């Protein structure tokens, strides 16, 4: 993949989530209102003093964020470190802020300032500054605090690069320069789409493709294994184990098709819409140029959204993508359940599949082994279904010119993409590739099945065939014995007409 995608993948592997206490280095304290021209560095307790429009706040000297970030940590103490804004969103912001700085330089932003912003934004995109983003998802529904967290971090890092004083907002101002031609209302949805697209391409689709390929290989491996089918969990007519697995292959294939079909709307970026979609305080061409820069940085086909009012006020694209993932979760739930039920036993279940044994299954029953990968996959599927409910509620609550469920929506979309991608890889590596067919058990169950009688329908009719099946079941006899005893056909006729290998498709 392209440069930014490689950097994002590398940064995720190196990600360290600090404790909630380390994030803000203690309780922030509100000081008397004033707006100094430069920040006053506090000599005690390793704080510096910064200000926002509400007044002064103490900021840890070892952090690049500023007053608005500190104020958010004071106002939204919800959930702790585990509820932080997803790092993919922060890294997407880094990509966006770099692209905006490039375009703003074309429109007259001081090249020295633009260059420093771009370098700092690159560090954000690469995950080098993850420790400086302490805010939780549960904040303003527009994501304004996170946008300002990004602006402050990039501003202070750029100031440091230029030899200035942290918190001074000189020579790089978080609003006037880093956020130039932007609003939280268009930057956050842009970052949402960038993050979602990257996660889909880096994690979700590769995971599903791996699972698809493994299931396809098993379908071919089991092509000659004839088994009894089941409908309503009851015996049905035969099919091959390969045919059964081919259904799973198609489900995963369609899952990828649906996800890819949702991506063109994800590639549309809100950047340039600013506050309500009109593009106030931007230059003509800014939106198109930013989208092109983001596309170049990520290697993904991003374009400017054709209607910025829709891009800010509604997030139907994310609901659509979440819906595709929800459908994938339904498919994976069915596949995992089928495989674990077919592997149930080892002596008292169906036992048609032999599943890999990966770890002890019980703290009290010696020798017990469980279908743990199937269980993990079904739990992931359930979580994704729940995530989609939240995304659906969020998407339906765009009021007037702005949807204010943005952070919650992207948190759940990214969570679903990551879980499905990772679970698909785990399920493939630790279960699917090691599945074996228990042909002895499969043959035994098939030969005992009463539904082989269906092959007699064209020869003796439905009613007589049903009589054979019911009588055989009642008496505990075989179909062949019962058919002969009832006088409906000879042994030779039964052997000629009831052949499982001839019951696998149309004639």
From Swiss-Prot:
The modification N6-acetyllysine is found at residues 58, 63, 77, 112, 119, 210, 220, 289, 499. Keywords: Acetylation, Chromosome, Cytoplasm, DNA damage, DNA repair, Lyase, Mitochondrion, Nucleus, Phosphoprotein, Transit peptide, Tricarboxylic acid cycle. The record marks 375 as: Important for catalytic activity. The modification N6-succinyllysine is found at residues 58, 63, 77, 112, 119, 220, 289, 464, 470. One of its GO terms (cellular component) is mitochondrion. This is Fumarate hydratase, mitochondrial. Homotetramer. Interacts with H2AZ1. The gene is Fh. It comes from Mus musculus (Mouse). The keyword DNA repair applies. There are 2 substrate-binding sites: the catalytic A site, and the non-catalytic B site that may play a role in the transfer of substrate or product between the active site and the solvent. Alternatively, the B site may bind allosteric effectors. GO terms for biological process: arginine metabolic process; DNA damage response; DNA repair; fumarate metabolic process; homeostasis of number of cells within a tissue; malate metabolic process; positive regulation of cold-induced thermogenesis; positive regulation of double-strand break repair via nonhomologous end joining. Pathway: Carbohydrate metabolism; tricarboxylic acid cycle; (S)-malate from fumarate: step 1/1. Substrate binds at residues 142-144, 173-176, 183-185, 231, 363, 368-370. Catalyzes the reversible stereospecific interconversion of fumarate to L-malate. Experiments in different species have demonstrated that specific isoforms of this protein act in defined pathways and favor one direction over the other. It comes from the Eukaryota. Its EC number is 4.2.1.2. The modification Phosphoserine is found at residue 363. Belongs to the class-II fumarase/aspartase family. Fumarase subfamily.
